[in-house]
C-alpha cells in the first residue's frame, strides 16, 4: 500500500501513459466535465483498485472531487477484510470512503431471484443512495475492456437486440454511471498497480462456475479467443459501432416523439380478457407516430416503452441504454417482432406478454403497453 497520495509525475512512464489514455477517453468519449464529483465503487479487486488510483492521479488535472463506497455483500468469510482493504487504500489515496452492508441472501430468498442478481441489485441501489448523500454527479465503475467481451456474450444468451447487444454503455446518464476504464485492458490495469507498488484483493468466487458470467469468462471466451486471437479488439469495435447506432436511433426517435408524443396513462378499471388481471399504468404509441416509421424504428420504440414502464423515473424519452442484469426490463426480440408483425397485418385482438409483468396489444393502429396488476 502506498504511504501518501501519488502524483502523476512521480510514477513510472508507462503507468503515466495509461492514466493519460484514460483521461483522453473520459474527456473525448465520455464527456466528463472538469470539476465533476465522482463516487467510486470499490471492491478491493484489481479493477476497482486501479480505478481509484487512476482517478486519484487525474483528480488535480481534471479538478475532480472523489468519494468512495465499498459494499459488503456478506457472501464470503473474508468480505470484511475486503472492506478493510478498501478503507486502507482510500486512506492512503486521501479519498473519503464509506462501507455499506447488503443483505443479499435475504433479498434473494424474499424475491425468489438468484444470488448474483440480488447482489447486483443491492449494490447499485446502495451506490445510488450514497451518490445522493455525498452529492456526486456520477458513480464511477471499474469495468474494463475484457468486461465488454463478457457482457456481449451475456446479452447474446439473453436475446438482447441491437444495438444493446454491443455491450454496456461507457456512460449511462439515466442511472448516472461512468466507466472510465472501459477501453483499457485488464492486464494493463494490473501492470499499473504492480508498477506503482499497490496490491489488491482476489475474490475466489470469480473462479466459481456457479455463476454464468464466470462460466463465460473461464470456459467460453478462451475457446473463442483461440478461434480469433483478436476477439476482444473485434468486440470493442462492435461496441463502438453499437454506440454510434444507439446515438443515431435516440436522435431519430426523439425527433419523432417530439412531433407525435406517446401517451402515458394511469391505468383502466376494466379487467383484461383473462378476467384476472387489471390494467396498471399504461403507455400508448399513437397510430400517427407508428405509421410513418420504418419497422426498425418501431421496434426500438417498443423497447423504449417497456423500459419506461419498468423505470418510469428515468425511461421517458432519454437515452435508451440497456440495463445489464435487469432481465424484466429486456423485452425479448421474438416477442417484439411478433408484435410488429401483428401491427403490420392489422391483427388487433392479439395480446403479447412481456418480461416484468407487462402486456402489449393493438388498438386502432396504436400500440398500448401496460403493467398488469392482480385483479381485486
Language-model features, listed with the residues they occupy:
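Core alpha/beta nucleotide-donor-binding catalytic domains of modification enzymes
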Residues: 2-222
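Alpha-helix boundary/capping and short turn/kink residues
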Residues: 158, 162, 186, 225-229, ...
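AMP-forming adenylation/ATP pyrophosphatase catalytic core
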Residues: 2-47, 67, 102, 122, ...
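Conserved anion/nucleotide-ligand pocket segment
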Residues: 218-219, 223-235
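Internal, active-site/partner-interface "lid" segment
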Residues: 206-213, 234-243
Amino acid at each position: 500500500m502506498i504511504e501518501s497520495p501519488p502524483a502523476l509525475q512521480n510514477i513510472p512512464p508507462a503507468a503515466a501513459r495509461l492514466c493519460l489514455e484514460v483521461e483522453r477517453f473520459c474527456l473525448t468519449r465520455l464527456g466528463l466535465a472538469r470539476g465533476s464529483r465522482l463516487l467510486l465503487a470499490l471492491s478491493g479487486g484489481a479493477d476497482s483498485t486501479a480505478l481509484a488510483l487512476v482517478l486519484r492521479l487525474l483528480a488535480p488535472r481534471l479538478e475532480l472531487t472523489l468519494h468512495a463506497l465499498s459494499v459488503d455483500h456478506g457472501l464470503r468469510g473474508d468480505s470484511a477484510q475486503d472492506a478493510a482493504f478498501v478503507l486502507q487504500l482510500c486512506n492512503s489515496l486521501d479519498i473519503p470512503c464509506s462501507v455499506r452492508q447488503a443483505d443479499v441472501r435475504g433479498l434473494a430468498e424474499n424475491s425468489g431471484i438468484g444470488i448474483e442478481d440480488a447482489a447486483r441489485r443491492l449494490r447499485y441501489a446502495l451506490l445510488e443512495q450514497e451518490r445522493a448523500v455525498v452529492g456526486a454527479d456520477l458513480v464511477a465503475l471499474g469495468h474494463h475492456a475484457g468486461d465488454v467481451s463478457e457482457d456481449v456474450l451475456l446479452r447474446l444468451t439473453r436475446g438482447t437486440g441491437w444495438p444493446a447487444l454491443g455491450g454496456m454503455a461507457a456512460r449511462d446518464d439515466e442511472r448516472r454511471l461512468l466507466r472510465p476504464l472501459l477501453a483499457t485492458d485488464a492486464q494493463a490495469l494490473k501492470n499499473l498497480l504492480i508498477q506503482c507498488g499497490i496490491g489488491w484483493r482476489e475474490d475466489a468466487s470469480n473462479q466459481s462456475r456457479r455463476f454464468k458470467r464466470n462460466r463465460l469468462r473461464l470456459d467460453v471466451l478462451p475457446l473463442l479467443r483461440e478461434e480469433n486471437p483478436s476477439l476482444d479488439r473485434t468486440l470493442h469495435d462492435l461496441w463502438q459501432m453499437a454506440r454510434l447506432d444507439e446515438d443515431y436511433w435516440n436522435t431519430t426517435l426523439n425527433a419523432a416523439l417530439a412531433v407525435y408524443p406517446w401517451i402515458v396513462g394511469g391505468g383502466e378499471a376494466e379487467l383484461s380478457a383473462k378476467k384476472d388481471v387489471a390494467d396498471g399504468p399504461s403507455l400508448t404509441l399513437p397510430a400517427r407516430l407508428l405509421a410513418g416509421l420504418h419497422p426498425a424504428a418501431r421496434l426500438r420504440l417498443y423497447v423504449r416503452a417497456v423500459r419506461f414502464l419498468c423505470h418510469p423515473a428515468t425511461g421517458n424519452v432519454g437515452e435508451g441504454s440497456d440495463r445489464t442484469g435487469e432481465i424484466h426490463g429486456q423485452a425479448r426480440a421474438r416477442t417484439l417482432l411478433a408484435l410488429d408483425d401483428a401491427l403490420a397485418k392489422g391483427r388487433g385482438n392479439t395480446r403479447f406478454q412481456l418480461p416484468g409483468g407487462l402486456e402489449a396489444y393493438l388498438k386502432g393502429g396504436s400500440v398500448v403497453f401496460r403493467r398488469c396488476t392482480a385483479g381485486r
